[in-house]
């Protein structure tokens, strides 16, 4: 969402698929929300500020609000990203049906619980790592969320990966960078 690096399309689409089935909403929606969040951190215009819009918006705001498509013109050029917006819920329901048909417990324990936990991590970060108009680092949230609580560093320089050894997102970017030659 910060255009910090460019990765091969096959890796982008691979990650897009897993973000899709984790129910984070279409990538276009997530990126637009994140870019808007950086524009309006913890104000009434912040799309997922728990302080102005409530905890539910921090938890599931990516799939509950309308977005400004002008913020994601770069992603709208990509056919797969546009298809993901159009068929988002179709894929979610088909995936759920496949898991349920294999074993109903897969639907709950291999999908809904992990997806819900991932969203819980995000909402914890937005609830406890933002106070006032400034993002803060919170060591305990950082430890519990494997790096997501070190949020002030992200707001100081959003294009920098790896702010802390526990930052798994930064570790993933570094791994992709060394293995896939991100330009």
Enumerate the language-model features and the residues they cover.
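Non-catalytic, topology-defining segments of multipass membrane proteins
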Residues: 1-124, 128, 160-183
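Active-site-proximal inter-transmembrane loops
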Residues: 132-157
């Amino acid at each position: 969402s910060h255009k910090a690096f460019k990765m091969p399309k096959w890796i982008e689409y691979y990650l897009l698929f897993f973000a899709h089935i984790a129910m984070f909403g279409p990538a276009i929606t997530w990126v637009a929300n994140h870019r808007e969040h950086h524009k309006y951190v913890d104000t009434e215009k912040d799309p997922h500020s728990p302080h102005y819009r409530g905890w539910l918006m921090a938890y599931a705001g990516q799939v509950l609000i309308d977005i400004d498509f002008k913020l994601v013109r770069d992603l709208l050029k990509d056919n797969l990203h546009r298809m993901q917006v159009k068929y988002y819920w179709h894929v979610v329901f088909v995936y759920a049906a496949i898991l349920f048909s294999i074993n109903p417990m897969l639907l709950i324990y291999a999908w809904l619980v992990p997806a819900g936990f991932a969203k819980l991590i995000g909402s914890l970060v937005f609830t406890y790592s933002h106070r006032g108009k400034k993002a803060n680092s919170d060591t305990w949230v950082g430890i519990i969320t494997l790096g997501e609580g070190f949020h002030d560093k992200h707001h100081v320089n959003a294009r920098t990966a790896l702010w802390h050894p526990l930052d798994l997102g930064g570790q993933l970017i570094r791994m992709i960078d060394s293995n896939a030659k991100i330009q």
